[in-house]
């Protein structure tokens, strides 16, 4: 899928899921135009702007790929967020945004969408885990271009403990550290035992 097709599908699905406008409007401004297509794959099952996963399919960190932005500086680095706006449930998102993963120092390699990870995770990957009695949650993968010289530490993001990951403010974090949103993908996920 081309970047322009991806943008159209992304915009449409974010609106249908009431993310933009809606619960993620502070993170993804209305009218946002990605400058790269963020590709995410869990064990060879690709995210496709809002498709459905079971929690058991998402236990291991996914592969991430994206092409260099047109006109971006050589050696530009990017930070990835994975966050849940529906914690603990979509009907009661009192712990939104749940911080599942913060991965800085991603660099697209020349000639394709392969990405090098040049820095350790600021928040280690914790797979989606909605309870079986919860409606499916929406999970956002957000890719930000880092300003030159950005050197974040784990303490800048927050603790790794379960309760320390809740009620994170990703929009404030991005603004404070000069991160520029350039790519978005998202999925829905339910517990392995969830039934409609």
Predicted regions and their residues:
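N-terminus-centered regions that define maturation/targeting leaders and the start
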Residues: 1-196
């Amino acid at each position: 899928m081309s970047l322009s097709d991806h943008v159209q599908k992304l915009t449409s699905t974010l609106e249908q899921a009431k993310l933009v406008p809606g619960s993620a409007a502070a993170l993804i401004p209305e009218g946002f135009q990605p400058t790269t297509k963020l590709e995410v794959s869990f064990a060879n099952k690709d995210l496709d702007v809002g498709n459905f996963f079971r929690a058991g399919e998402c236990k291991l960190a996914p592969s991430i790929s994206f092409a260099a932005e047109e006109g971006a500086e050589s050696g530009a680095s990017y930070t990835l967020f994975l966050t849940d706006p529906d914690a603990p449930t979509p009907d009661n998102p009192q712990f939104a945004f749940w911080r599942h993963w913060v991965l800085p120092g991603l660099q697209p390699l020349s000639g394709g969408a392969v990405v090098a990870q040049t820095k350790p995770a600021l928040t280690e990957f914790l797979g989606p885990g909605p309870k079986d009695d919860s409606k499916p949650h929406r999970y956002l993968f957000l890719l930000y271009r880092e300003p030159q010289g950005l050197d974040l530490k784990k303490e800048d993001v927050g603790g790794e403990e379960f309760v320390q990951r809740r009620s994170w403010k990703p929009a404030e974090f991005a603004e404070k550290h000069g991160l520029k949103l350039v790519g978005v993908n998202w999925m829905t996920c339910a517990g392995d035992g969830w039934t409609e």
